[in-house]
């Protein structure tokens, strides 16, 4: 069978809410030549069954996917499975406040575990449907001190609508050209004075914000 076709079918089914079949078709991504290989670990891949020990969930794609699917870590922990979540180092500070689990940055030593599972494979293991997607929101919370500090900073911008901008994703992603753009493409919008524009961009593309200093608030270095 054509693994790429199955993977794309999985995405199409998930877009239409056809679950759990969509999740199972999406598992074919691991057999696609252009997809990263499954991590080789000294413990077995979790099959969705009971465990006598901790389960390692590891992020496999970008920040957005990890943020969306990390909800499954506390979901499993509340059902009696000790969970260790391995995430991108940039997300460690945010995820550290998830209750009931242990969080480690990618590349660091992990506590003892008896099985592992890619984070985006958990729904397939659980047979997730639209009705059973963990929906306890919010499932992420910032540090209260940070929240107060940034609330004060944003309030100082006045009563104008406040709009955060991210114009580029990870440039190493194979289809990045379909989703990223140059900030100059938004120049006409940024010149509007009835909106407070705030850069939320990270990485190399964040340097483009300097061109709009005074119109685009850039606090990403703080």
Model-derived regions: residue spans:
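Alpha-helical solenoid repeat scaffolds of the TPR/TPR-like class and their adjacent stem/linker regions
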Residues: 1-222
